């Protein structure tokens, strides 16, 4: 029976292990990995590989991994080895990641596109497969004779069932500006993180309110007709979308959205765990990601973006005479927050980078607020409703239509006496 192999790659400095002071708040990657059932209701096996983020370990490793990307290539090869060691024809591949982990699984998908997925008896060639991918010259491009010959001789021809990422940042998942950025580009620029046709379903959760320059969003450009791609904007900064803050009300919205997408494709979750661990709240705390270091070194702010913020649905020049599509839209919870978070001490939620047509919810959806229970949206199988959040959630209800009166008939002359 076909199995599901799931890679869950966490962001920089993120781990599921306890630190001083107890267990760290889990990221969405940790929750996703813990929520996946090992055996489905029909007896299929689901095997999860969790990869902690780069920069874990000694203070030196934290510095090298967080700033310089140390360990990134090793992480990609480790994920690839997990798939090589476990894959059998017919198995489905699911790849999930947050932040630098998102870059990791995107690059992993690029490596599979270039070198294929090695058959188990050729696992000793993983280094060769990575070198072939790393070269990225005309001679070793995925469509080159050498790459095709390598895949045909040693690898499975596989497709990726689902590629899901939370706030994939930076063209390389690394700093992209200044001397350090140029060095990182020269060292890691070979990675292929574009969306190719061998990915069947791709989902990207993006943070509306992030404004740090190194955290430029890496938006997919969709070139494959018929490919299922959604890039959805959520309220919050980087970790409000990918998780890791004590208040997980906002990040759980992005998690529940991703789980629903994966469940619709067949991935099954432990309903008991999800009901305890996932608590969505559109009015959850929006954290300030500008740490003291970022505030002191204001050069990290994004001068290219208005008000230092991200551009949503940014117009892109045509390519080869064809429009470039990104399939971006804003999640419904943002509209809910626009209506809910409007009182002290937080004040109104009004991100200045929302497109004009989205800054105010459509008129037909604004006037009426009803409890979610009165109009609960349909959910994908395998993802139960989360437990009641701290604040009562509200759904936007349609504006009731006003009755239209028939035009009055012209008066008739009274009958003659």
Feature roles, as predicted:
Residues 1-417:
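Active-site- or binding-pocket-proximal scaffold segments within functional domains
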